């Protein structure tokens, strides 16, 4: 059976129905995880910071260059090397995403001695920035989550009904995330990080007002410090995400520290 990634609806991002299920065989997850790199020109000093891009569902590592993200970063003349991970849905479906990203992409790159590691991802990749950071808090300096998928609507409605993330009565921490608990655990972790109760990266969020995920993303926005959310007119698409990336590259701790 051939399954088109782009034909899968956004609801398929509900990993609770995909992790460790038979349907995972429809979504490839090659080992090692493939990646594409863009390094500083040889004439420049060694880059201080590493950016790891994580694609959305149906996208691939090369899209970050093809759709202008790499050029946008280069335009700002930052001390940055970039690598895009081909972190497709199959890795999430098999629950191997954090391990493969660490082993195949992040650790080999970090061996070069970067001072900071930043993750940038959209939609499924936005979730990935948080999913990975929860288990690697000491390694990740910060993230830019663009229109991240943050679980099913019923959960975000529950959080909203309780007054938002700050007042939500979340579950106890779990040691191992799986398809049954990852959504609540991500939100619980976000609550703990934004309260200063657990270590975590410097979180930045960007999304368009007309994005299909805006109602859940605004719950996270309300819990972040001032200046850590970029909100513009736009939808769930690369055009909007590229503008949001530009805002982040102009005004963020990343922009200030990776020069």
Briefly describe each language-model feature range:
Residues 16-17:
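Residue-level signal for mature regions of secreted extracellular proteins and peptides
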Residues 20-22:
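C-terminal motif of bacterial Sec signal peptides marking the signal peptidase cleavage site
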Residues 2-12:
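Bacterial N-terminal signal peptides that target proteins for export
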């Amino acid at each position: 059976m051939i399954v088109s990634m782009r034909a899968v609806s956004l609801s398929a991002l509900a990993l609770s129905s995909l992790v460790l299920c038979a349907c995972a065989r429809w979504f490839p997850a090659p080992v090692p995880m493939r990646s594409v790199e863009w390094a500083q020109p040889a004439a420049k000093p060694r880059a201080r910071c590493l950016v790891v891009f994580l694609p959305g569902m149906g996208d691939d590592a090369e899209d970050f260059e093809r759709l202008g993200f790499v050029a946008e970063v280069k335009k700002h003349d930052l001390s940055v090397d970039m690598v895009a991970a081909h972190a497709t849905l199959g890795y999430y479906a098999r629950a191997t995403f954090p391990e493969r990203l660490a082993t195949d992409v992040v650790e080999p790159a970090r061996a070069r001695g970067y001072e900071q590691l930043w993750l940038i991802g959209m939609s499924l990749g936005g979730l990935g920035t948080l999913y990975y950071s929860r288990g690697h808090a000491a390694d990740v300096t910060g993230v830019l989550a663009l229109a991240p998928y943050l679980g099913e609507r019923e959960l975000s409605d529950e959080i909203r009904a309780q007054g938002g993330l700050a007042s939500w009565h979340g579950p106890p921490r779990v040691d191992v995330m799986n398809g049954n608990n990852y959504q609540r655990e991500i939100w619980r972790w976000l609550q703990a990080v934004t309260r200063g109760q657990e270590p975590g990266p410097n979180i930045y969020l960007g999304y368009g007002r007309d994005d299909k995920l805006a109602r859940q993303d605004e719950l996270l926005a309300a819990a972040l410090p001032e200046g850590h959310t970029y909100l513009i007119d736009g939808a769930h698409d690369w055009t909007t995400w590229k503008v949001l990336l530009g805002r982040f590259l102009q005004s963020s701790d990343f922009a200030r520290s990776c020069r």
